[in-house]
């Protein structure tokens, strides 16, 4: 049993990290399309082409199920991918409903808002708009595109002054004291929880969709009786090339270590 996890780059490691904790006996194939990152500024047709290639590659490597660990690729391509390939394909969904539920439970639920941060394509896409319309009857959800965070993450620039300055400039457009939740609508954004926590008011919760995505995967594997691995392992690929280089594997290790540190920040 092999599970393929695909992202435009290294943001999807946050989804892999969640999967490693919840599926200790499965084999994983992680595909980072670093040749074409970032996806957030590309056209829908380009993303569909890249995503189709990635899924086919993972199937050729033996994947029995696919997780699209990329909100942008999910938004642009998941319907077409599910129609094209005959295996379970799980996508990402910004945790807007989770944020809305938390807001309703709060003491000031009538007045507090939710901010979704994502890539430009996700922000402009129909999938996010439909999700917000479905769960936000009171019109308390706003969206913000933060494309530079993907670039910062891919270059391993996490808590630097440039990142914090960028975030402060972008968040200055909003009265953050009026918000109760920040939804991370891009898997790359999980690397910046410390900087986000430093800038946001204490009452603003940081919410991502990783746990929900892996729970959906587990449910689907159980339904299809596919989860029967005998030991955990991970193979890494940059686009079509398997990673053997110790330097790159060490780099991936640093990313995973940072993600574990970020899990402590809410």
Curated annotation (Swiss-Prot):
Binding site for substrate: 7-8, 39-40, 71-72, 187-188
Keywords on record: Cell shape, Cell wall biogenesis/degradation, Isomerase, Peptidoglycan synthesis
Top-rank taxon: Bacteria
Keyword Cell wall biogenesis/degradation: yes
Database matches in InterPro entries: Asp/Glu/hydantoin_racemase, Asp/Glu_race, Asp/Glu_racemase_AS_1, Glu_race
Annotated signal peptide: none
Catalytic activity as recorded in UniProt: L-glutamate = D-glutamate
Any coiled-coil regions, as ranges: none
Pathway assigned in UniProt: Cell wall biogenesis; peptidoglycan biosynthesis
Catalytic center residues: 70 (proton donor/acceptor), 186 (proton donor/acceptor)
UniProt-listed SUPFAM superfamilies: Aspartate/glutamate racemase
Pfam family of the protein (one): Asp_Glu_race
GO molecular function: glutamate racemase activity
Keyword Lipoprotein: no
Enzyme Commission (EC) number: 5.1.1.3
Gene Ontology BP annotations: cell wall organization; peptidoglycan biosynthetic process; regulation of cell shape
Function: Provides the (R)-glutamate required for cell wall biosynthesis.
Family listed: Belongs to the aspartate/glutamate racemases family.
NCBIfam families in the record: glut_race
Designated name of the protein: Glutamate racemase
Protein species of origin: Campylobacter curvus (strain 525.92)
Source species taxonomy: Bacteria, Pseudomonadati, Campylobacterota, Epsilonproteobacteria, Campylobacterales
Gene name in the database record: murI
